[in-house]
């Protein structure tokens, strides 16, 4: 995936002395093998064949850089992944979820909203695109009180601009299939498929759906 090249490019734009490639790689390993906090992930990496040569503070410092360069990292990983295996990007799936924080006061993007776990805590919303094989393509994080339907256009616009991906069928559940989102995915060489409840369909439409 040429993560080394990605990290070299990032370092040219930032002033830091730690090894971003080593930190990013170890965080991915830890997330797959033993998902936990950054502190626990750092401790876990100490048990690997090649333990970290960076400090825990370096991990914390790198997080702001990774967050700032998130869009660049995602687009480069997508482009580089095509060298390993051609991505099936003719169909893209989009969905949202949210994450809660065990805090009481709102701050930044952590806002009170409708938690999917029915938690009374501030949350953030994450929107994620996957390709037809279920491999993640791009994601972004939004304020927890933002309507999920409005998260689509900004992220899809990034895909159109940065991923060189403009001919696909957009698929989502009915909750993300607003008129504005359907209209947006009728432009260019895009189309859409939105799930729809049979119970809410008109009788004639339901008969066609059940007997195509």
Enumerate the predicted regions with their spans:
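Short, flexible loop/turn motifs enriched in small residues
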Residues: 118-124
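Generic structural signal for residues positioned in beta-strands
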Residues: 125-127, 191
């Amino acid at each position: 995936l040429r993560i080394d090249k990605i990290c070299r490019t990032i370092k040219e734009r930032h002033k830091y002395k730690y090894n971003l490639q080593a930190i990013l790689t170890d965080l991915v390993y830890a997330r797959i093998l033993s998902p936990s906090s950054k502190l626990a992930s750092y401790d876990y990496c100490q048990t690997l064949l090649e333990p970290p040569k960076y400090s825990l503070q370096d991990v914390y410092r790198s997080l702001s850089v990774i967050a700032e360069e998130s869009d660049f990292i995602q687009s480069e990983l997508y482009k580089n992944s095509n060298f390993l295996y051609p991505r099936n990007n003719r169909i893209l799936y989009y969905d949202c979820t949210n994450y809660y924080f065990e805090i009481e006061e709102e701050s930044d993007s952590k806002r009170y909203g409708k938690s999917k776990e029915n938690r009374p805590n501030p949350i953030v919303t994450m929107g994620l695109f996957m390709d037809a094989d279920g491999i993640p393509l791009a994601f972004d994080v939004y304020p927890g009180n933002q309507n999920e339907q409005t998260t689509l256009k900004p992220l899809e616009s990034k895909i159109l601009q940065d991923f060189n991906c403009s001919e696909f069928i957009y698929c989502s559940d009915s909750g993300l299939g607003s008129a504005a989102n359907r209209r947006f995915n009728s432009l260019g060489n895009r189309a859409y498929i939105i799930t729809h409840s049979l119970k809410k369909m008109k009788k004639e439409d339901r008969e066609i759906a059940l007997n195509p």
